[in-house]
């Protein structure tokens, strides 16, 4: 329970009293209201900071030049089914009604909560006379796939009969440590499968096994070898490990040996509590909103392609700092977001 915490809402009757929350032993992400309470704790910390206090509100503190938080409510609302059931209804299911992303009532409530919570921050900024000098950036690190509920196809599914995930096909190629149920390690399998092999020299054999089981795993596309290296550093163990994040000879252990992308709508799960997932390359995963607000910025829609990686250098430029102070900006040539500064600034490297 979180006594004294009420969730933000667009109307009083929509607010949830977190003091009435009775945890059932699961985490915050297993309940539509619990995730709002979790987010509201973070919102309250930001509100305290705006009002010139520590995040707990216990004492005075300088207002930060930059602050932010991560909302989980919309992400959870997109994929959660609670109570878990093979039958999805408006009473137990978030996500969307159709392929055009019409939100179900549970999902709409999560969106409205986040809307109201951001409204609390805006109101606090105005109260403290900070709104006119503040830029607000709202975006997402990922979406959820599939948006269309009719395309959701869990493998193996609760019945276990919908197919076999890649880990079930190439178990003999995987490190033995994955077999220990207590080590917390395993493949990253959601709406994508990222595979680290016990022996990278057997990559071609593992790929052949996956392709032979294409129907069972819902195979869409496989990246390995040269095709994988066009996206990431080559997989492997560095010959001479250097400082963090430097490119190193001999391979990068963060890169899997194989990346398998299933057909659209396939999610590797046997869990009845989810109807979508993230982490993959699907359009629903990677196409997210990005809103920048400042009283000096004219309201308009920018239709040019941008990436969320551009947010970080944009923040530095807004603060009067050099975006090139970031290694990634220098190495990858990441520009600031377009149309926010003087003409030509969006081409800054």
Residue ranges and their predicted role:
Residues 1-58, 332-338:
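Active-site-proximal alpha/beta segments of enzymes that process anionic O-linked groups
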């Amino acid at each position: 329970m979180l006594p004294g915490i009420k969730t933000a809402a667009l109307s009083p009757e929509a607010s949830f009293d977190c003091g009435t929350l009775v945890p059932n032993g699961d985490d915050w992400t297993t309940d539509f209201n619990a995730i709002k309470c979790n987010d509201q704790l973070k919102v309250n910390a930001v509100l305290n900071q705006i009002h010139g206090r520590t995040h707990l509100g216990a004492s005075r503190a300088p207002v930060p030049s930059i602050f932010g938080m991560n909302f989980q409510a919309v992400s959870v609302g997109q994929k959660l089914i609670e109570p878990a059931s093979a039958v999805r209804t408006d009473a137990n299911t978030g996500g969307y009604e159709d392929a055009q992303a019409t939100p179900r009532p549970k999902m709409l409530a999560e969106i409205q909560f986040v809307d109201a919570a951001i409204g609390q921050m805006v109101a606090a900024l105005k109260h403290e006379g900070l709104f006119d000098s503040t830029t607000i950036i709202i975006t997402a690190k990922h979406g959820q796939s599939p948006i269309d509920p009719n395309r959701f196809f869990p493998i193996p599914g609760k019945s276990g009969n919908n197919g076999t995930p890649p880990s079930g096909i190439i178990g003999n190629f995987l490190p033995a440590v994955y077999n220990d149920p207590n080590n917390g390690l395993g493949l990253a399998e959601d709406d994508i499968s990222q595979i680290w092999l016990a022996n990278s020299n057997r990559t071609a054999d593992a790929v052949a096994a996956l392709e032979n089981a294409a129907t069972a795993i819902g195979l869409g596309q496989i990246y390995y070898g040269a095709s994988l290296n066009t996206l990431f550093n080559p997989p492997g163990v560095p010959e001479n490990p250097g400082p963090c994040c430097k490119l190193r000879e001999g391979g990068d252990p963060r890169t899997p040996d194989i990346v398998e992308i299933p057909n659209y709508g396939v999610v590797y799960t046997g869990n009845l509590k989810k109807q979508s997932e993230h982490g993959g390359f699907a359009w629903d995963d990677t196409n997210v909103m990005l809103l920048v607000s400042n009283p000096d910025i004219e309201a308009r829609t920018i239709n040019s392609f941008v990436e969320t990686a551009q947010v970080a250098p944009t923040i530095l430029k807004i603060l009067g700092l050099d975006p090139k102070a970031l290694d990634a900006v220098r190495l990858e040539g990441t520009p600031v977001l377009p149309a926010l500064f003087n003409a030509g600034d969006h081409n800054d490297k």
